[in-house]
């Protein structure tokens, strides 16, 4: 099922993309209030048991101090894929902290989906290796050259980072500020509700989350697709076909991995 942005989200993010230095930032609490009801139900217990007010104060304060904080739409992954529709979870670490140039404008690479970048932004090295693995598994080339993965999100792939914000040019700058506890709780909740799912854990950071997942799910582990580690076992891992074979056996719709972009 393709889920469109709800009216609350649309009201927050209806402005055209702007230069990276001028990116607006909607307060975190306001973005949480705009979440779809299903995700809000999942996240409310997580918010209640973590330092959410302090995290909001930190992120909003950094932005108020004039620091470019990426992405603008922090919870975009949750707006594109409903709880019931999540069939595959691909876990990232923190958002891209760099920028790209589109039509002469500098814009953030991060747009709320792990490993994904806005259309027109150069495909990052890790995503190039993900594409390379998919092409090898399915024996054909991916159409186009975009790194925007919203098509996967609309098919039921939750592209989730464990940290949801970052300062421009400062990798892991928002790590250990409270996001990890919230996304850990989200993963635990997601693993407990509804149907069984596929979890793709690439690299030691993602694999450390294995203990959060209840039994019965398909958990696929491999080295990170970064150029530093992809040749140590990510390339050749077979995860995408394995995921589809398992989903088919569960009588769930499979993912068309050859269509990462939205229709």
From Swiss-Prot:
Its EC number is 3.2.2.27. The keyword NAD does not apply. Coiled coil: none annotated. InterPro entries: UDG_fam1 (IPR002043), Ura-DNA_Glyclase_AS (IPR018085), Uracil-DNA_glycosylase-like (IPR005122), Uracil-DNA_glycosylase-like_sf (IPR036895). It is an enzyme of class 3 (hydrolase). GO terms for biological process: base-excision repair, AP site formation via deaminated base removal. Keywords: Cytoplasm, DNA damage, DNA repair, Hydrolase. It comes from the Bacteria. GO terms for molecular function: uracil DNA N-glycosylase activity. The active site is at residue 94. It is found in: Cytoplasm. This is Uracil-DNA glycosylase. The lineage of its organism: Bacteria, Pseudomonadati, Pseudomonadota, Betaproteobacteria, Burkholderiales. The gene is ung.
């Amino acid at each position: 099922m393709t889920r469109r942005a709800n009216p609350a989200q649309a009201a927050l993010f209806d402005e055209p993309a702007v230069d990276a230095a001028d990116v607006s930032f909607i307060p975190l609490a306001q973005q949480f209030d705009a979440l779809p009801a299903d995700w809000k139900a999942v996240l409310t217990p997580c918010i209640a048991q973590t330092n959410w007010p302090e995290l909001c104060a930190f992120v909003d304060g950094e932005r108020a101090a004039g620091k470019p904080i990426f992405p603008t739409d922090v919870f975009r992954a949750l707006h594109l894929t409903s709880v019931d529709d999540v069939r595959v979870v691909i876990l990232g670490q923190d958002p891209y902290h760099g920028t790209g140039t589109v039509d002469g404008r500098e814009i953030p690479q991060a747009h709320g989906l792990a490993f994904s970048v806005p259309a027109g932004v150069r495909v990052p090295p890790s995503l190039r290796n993900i594409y390379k693995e998919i092409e090898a598994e399915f024996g054909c080339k991916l159409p186009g050259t975009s790194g925007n993965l919203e098509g996967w999100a609309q098919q039921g792939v939750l592209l989730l980072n464990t940290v949801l914000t970052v300062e421009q040019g400062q990798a892991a700058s928002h790590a250990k500020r409270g996001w990890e506890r919230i996304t850990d709780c989200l993963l635990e909740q997601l693993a407990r509700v509804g149907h069984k799912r596929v979890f793709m854990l690439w690299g030691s950071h993602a694999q450390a989350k294995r203990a959060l997942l209840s039994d019965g799910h398909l958990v696929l582990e491999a080295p990170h697709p970064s150029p530093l580690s992809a040749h140590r076992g990510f390339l050749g891992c077979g995860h995408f076909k394995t995921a589809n074979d398992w989903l088919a056996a569960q009588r769930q719709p499979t993912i068309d991995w050859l269509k990462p972009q939205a229709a």
